Amino acid sequence: VWVTVSVPEDAKPGKYSGKLTVTAANAKARSLPIEIRVADHVLPPVRDWTFHLDLWQNPYAVARLESVPLWSEEHFEAMRPVMSLLADAGQKSVTATLINRPWNGQTYDAFGSMVTKVRRIDGTWLFDYTIFDRWVEFMFSLGIDRQINCYSMIPWAMEFDFYNQATGLNDCVRTVAGSPEYE
């Protein structure tokens, strides 16, 4: 059980005690004793912390857990309390994904690309950063704004996904370093 207690800056040092009531569906409420010791020290504002906290965020997992459409207004509202906890803990970095599944199959919720890549009918490329920009701006608005970690420039299987306007399908290029496609 995780309990978060917000202690006002002007709280007097000492021990505080009380009861914590725990409730759950289909269970009787229980009261538990709780004791908190307030130290004679006030932390500086989170913005001034020099500790570099960099925990990876997975917005795709939040959408799944909350059953909301990915990148919708409901998704951003569902992420707000989760990412605010990170900001309050001193998180400095935004985790952004440039390709699909940058960690291959190593996470339960696959990370998608925040950049849409389109090969146009004339063979030129379009890179749409709308989702990337919205995600980064959202995280910056919460105070997580010191660094953006972008994963990954090179995919595991050297497969680069894109939308092919000529076929109307999602496609990919499989390549190796040094090949014309890679260049």
Task: Spell out what each predicted region is.
Residues 1-3:
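Surface-exposed binding patches on compact interaction domains or structured appendages
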